[in-house]
Amino acid sequence: MTAIRKAGATGNKILLPGNDYTSAGAFISNGSGAALMKVTNLDGSTTNLIFDVHRYLDSDNSGTHMTCTTNNVGDFTNLGKWLRTNKRQAILTETGGGPSDSSCLKAVCEQLDVLNQYSDAYLGWTGWAAGMFASSYELSEVPTKNGNSWTDVPLVTQCIAGKFKK
């Protein structure tokens, strides 16, 4: 932190990942939150120091299964309350589920609704597997080209992009 800030990046946001794959579900209980609360800027403030969390919705939170077994509402509600209490912010930098699986369309949208309810604490989210992933990858969010236009997968349309507050 010191080297980054001393290099002149005083107004830039810096993401602070935790341990245990920076899991939002374990961020408080595994000590990540407590440890990262001690990280400060040169002036002792925590301005622009953002916690970086991940959370998938499959059975083992690995992001390797097409179906979703949880909506993580409890995890993100608890973390959102903790962030508010401690006047801190986080960003969900990895999340996702099966791109057209009905269980994931429901669960991912519900998860992101909670992040919107705590929009003062959560800066946003990033869907995992958007970009140059092979279309055969289980959680691919890569659009398909149809003639001159592109078609997003349902998960992106309904949840990942669809839940951004306007």
What are these regions (language model features)?
Residues Y137:
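Substrate-binding cleft and catalytic face of glycoside hydrolase catalytic domains
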Residues M1-L123, S140-C159:
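Extracellular glycoside hydrolase catalytic/binding regions
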Residues C159-K166:
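C-terminal helix/juxtamembrane-tail motif
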